A protein has these predicted regions:
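Short, highly charged, low-complexity non-transmembrane loops/tails of multi-pass membrane proteins
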Residues: 254-274
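"…together with the soluble PPM/PP2C metallo-phosphatase catalytic core" -> "…together
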Residues: 1-254
Length: 274
């Protein structure tokens, strides 16, 4: 976790010039022009951290957790790249947002970058879960958990720091529920990166974009798949399906603002928050 935090802080500093390029510029919720897609650093941090830990483990003649870390960081890399595509090439009309928007575009003969992200994310989830789970039931449930977790994180990424905070809380719950299962080591690297990127996100120095939200959600979904029993995974899937369906009709931001405890937590640490 700490390694992820440190590497994220270093990577943000070293790549500041990269994200000043026009292709990464977008407007945030205040209408300010800032860098978007900085969340693509999450898989970079994860890969570097996993590489360093693998070398350390080899020196210590320890092999535990190497495969779990590799699966998580490579999956996160795939989801982040799909999100980055939407960040830099999908600055289209609001009508194309959400499942219904992408479906309308597809019916009219247009394949949006958001649709590419959803289809690609679903396929990636099937491939990854297929390597972990042998049965059909496990495959369908777990692939849906990973893909919908990534999309749910995207739905939450509508205000500075919101997605990062929810990621930290969700990981803490998962960590406690699984009694600090060692298979969460790879997910912990991603969460460490989330901690390192949170201050800049809250201060509106940059936006994570779909690249970051996708990465966070996919990592958490994969963490559930790797550590929880079938009943728990089905329960998580039901919640994720419900959130995705509700999002088509209700604004999460409005719901959060209308609920004092959630509003306080959502605005905690944010620039200009009441």
């Amino acid at each position: 976790l700490l390694l992820g935090v440190l590497l994220a802080l270093v990577s943000v500093t070293l790549t500041r010039g990269v994200f000043e390029a026009p292709v990464f510029q977008d407007t945030n919720h205040r209408g300010r022009a800032i860098a978007v897609g900085v969340g693509v650093l999450v898989p970079v941090v994860g890969l570097v951290a996993a590489g360093l830990l693998t070398i350390t483990d080899r020196i210590r003649h320890v092999q535990t957790g190497v495969g779990d870390r590799a699966i998580v960081v490579l999956t996160v890399a795939g989801f982040a790249l799909l999100g980055l595509l939407d960040d830099v090439a999908g600055k289209g009309a609001p009508a194309d947002k959400g499942f219904r928007g992408h479906l309308r575009a597809l019916v009219s003969g247009r394949l949006t970058t958001g649709a590419v992200k959803l289809i690609g994310g679903g396929a990636l989830a099937v491939v990854v879960v297929g390597a972990l789970q042998p049965g059909w039931t496990d495959l369908l449930v777990d692939a849906a958990v990973v893909a919908l977790a990534a999309n749910t994180a995207n739905l939450l990424d509508r205000a500075p720091g919101r997605c990062g905070k929810v990621t930290l809380v969700a990981f803490a719950v998962l960590w406690a529920a699984t009694r600090a299962d060692t298979r969460l080591a790879g997910v912990a690297l991603v969460v460490g990166a989330a901690i390192g990127l949170l201050p800049g996100d809250l201060d509106e120095r940059f936006m994570l974009g779909d690249a970051g939200a996708n990465a966070y959600g996919a990592a958490l979904g994969l963490g559930v798949v790797m550590t929880c029993g079938l009943a728990a995974r089905v329960g998580v899937l039901v919640v994720l399906v419900a959130l995705n369906v509700v999002s088509e009709f209700v604004s999460f931001s409005r719901g959060i603002d209308a609920t004092p405890p959630l509003r306080w937590f959502d605005r905690l640490g944010r620039r200009g928050a009441d």
